[in-house]
């Protein structure tokens, strides 16, 4: 059985605990879908002020990202490469941290409550296979500390997926 720890109020300590929890969850599990599903649940239930956490996977033949495991309201199923925050992060291969999604050109509004967003590329064996997308109903929700630790979260997940 798994238990999600309560937030202590110390953001860095909370993220360090989150990383340990992810490592424990993925340590002996080789099924990718299970690991992505549990990772999205862990983020959704651990991070404050988050209304969506999940993954989109690249379908190269279609030029689109397709919805994967997530927590939150039903979401857009397909996002073209280079469109919206997710498609831009995938196309550029870098983190997109958006303080106000309404000011982002071409933002795709899957949930009208979302006000800020962070999207991180997910790589397996060096190749971008998709993105981790986290939304918040609060503007300016994600800062440098979030980006630092969520990048480590993605890297920890990538190691588990490479097994």
From Swiss-Prot:
Gene3D superfamilies: 3.30.450.40. One of its GO terms (cellular component) is cytosol. Pfam families: GAF_2. GO terms for molecular function: L-methionine-(R)-S-oxide reductase activity. InterPro entries: FRMsr_CS, GAF, GAF-like_dom_sf, Phosphatase_reg/MetRdx. Belongs to the free Met sulfoxide reductase family. This is Protein YtsP. The lineage of its organism: Bacteria, Bacillati, Bacillota, Bacilli, Bacillales.
């Amino acid at each position: 059985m798994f238990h999600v720890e309560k937030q202590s109020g110390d953001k860095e300590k909370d993220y360090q605990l989150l990383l340990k929890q992810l490592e424990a969850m993925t340590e002996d599990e080789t099924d990718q879908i299970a690991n992505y599903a549990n990772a999205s649940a862990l983020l959704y239930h651990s991070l404050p002020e988050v209304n969506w956490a999940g993954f989109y996977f690249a379908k190269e033949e279609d030029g689109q990202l397709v919805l994967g495991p997530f927590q939150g309201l039903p979401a857009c199923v397909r996002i073209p490469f280079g469109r919206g925050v997710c498609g831009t992060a995938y196309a550029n291969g870098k983190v997109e941290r958006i303080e106000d999604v309404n000011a982002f050109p071409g933002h795709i509004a899957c949930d009208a409550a979302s006000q800020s967003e962070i999207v991180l590329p997910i790589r397996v064996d060096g190749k971008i296979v998709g993105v981790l997308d986290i939304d918040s109903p609060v503007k300016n929700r994600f800062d440098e500390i979030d980006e630092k630790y969520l990048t480590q979260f993605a890297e920890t997940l990538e190691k588990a997926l490479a097994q």
